[in-house]
A protein has these predicted regions:
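Conserved acetyl-CoA pyrophosphate-binding loop and the N-cap/start of the following alpha-helix
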Residues: 104, 108-116
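Short amphipathic alpha-helix that is part of the acyltransferase structural core
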Residues: 5-40, 68
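Conserved GNAT acetyl-CoA-binding A-motif
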Residues: 121-134
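Conserved beta-strand-loop-alpha-helix junction that forms the acyl-donor binding cleft
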Residues: 131-142, 158-163
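Conserved acetyl-CoA-binding loop of GNAT-fold acetyltransferases
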Residues: 145-155
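A short, internal acetyl-CoA/4′-phosphopantetheine-binding micro-motif in the GNAT/acyltransferase core
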Residues: 98-105, 135
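Acyl-donor-binding surface of acyltransferase catalytic domains
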Residues: 1-12, 156-162
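A conserved beta-strand-loop-helix scaffold within acyl/acetyltransferase catalytic domains
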Residues: 36-98
Length: 163
C-alpha cells in the first residue's frame, strides 16, 4: 500500500500540473541545473523537448504561499511509456524529472510530490511506478525513494568517447 500524503503545513500545497506552472517550473529547474550540476539554463523550447509521453495528470508542483506571491518549491514531471509495458510485463508510470529547490530540501516536499504522482498513477490503473536516478546524484533523493518503497531493479552504465 502507498503511504499517505505528508502534512506540509497550511502554506505549502501540492497542485496538479497546469500550463500556468510551466514558466515557474522551468525557472526552478534552471536554478537547480545551475546550482547542482553547473549546467546552463534551458530555453523554453529545450524544456518542452522530449515530452511525447508526458502525463500531466501524473505531474505536480509544490507551491509555497508564505509570501505575497506563490513560489514553486518543487516539481515532478511524469510520463506514460505505453510502448514499454508489454516488454516490462506490467503497466508503469514513470517519474522523469523531480526537482526540489534547496530551501525546501529539509521538508517533505519531495515525498509529497512523489506520492501525489504515485497515487494518481494507481488511480489510473498502473501496476508500478518507476524512475531513474543517476548514481552521481548527491541531493539525497535516493534516500527519499528508498523510504517510499522504491527498490533498484536494474542498473545502466553510459559510455562515451570523444570522436
Amino acid at each position: 500500500d502507498l503511504a499517505p500524503m505528508p502534512d506540509l503545513g497550511s502554506y505549502m500545497s501540492i497542485e496538479a500540473w497546469d500550463p500556468q506552472w510551466e514558466e515557474p517550473a522551468l525557472r526552478a529547474a534552471n536554478r537547480l541545473n545551475e546550482s547542482e550540476w553547473g549546467r546552463p539554463p534551458l530555453t523554453q523550447e529545450q524544456w518542452m523537448q522530449g515530452r511525447t509521453a508526458f502525463a500531466p495528470e501524473w505531474s505536480f508542483v509544490a507551491v509555497d504561499r508564505t509570501g505575497d506571491r506563490p513560489r514553486v518549491a518543487g516539481f515532478l514531471l511524469a510520463s506514460r511509456y505505453e510502448q514499454d509495458w508489454a516488454a516490462l510485463g506490467w503497466c508503469e508510470g514513470y517519474i522523469d524529472q523531480l526537482g526540489v529547490l534547496s530551501a525546501w530540501r529539509e521538508t517533505r516536499v519531495a515525498d509529497a510530490l512523489i506520492l501525489a504522482s504515485m497515487w494518481a498513477q494507481k488511480r489510473d490503473g498502473m501496476d508500478r511506478s518507476g524512475t531513474g536516478v543517476g548514481s552521481a546524484n548527491h541531493t539525497g533523493v535516493l534516500a527519499v525513494y528508498d523510504s517510499l518503497g522504491f527498490r533498484t531493479v536494474g542498473q545502466t552504465r553510459l559510455y562515451a568517447i570523444e570522436v
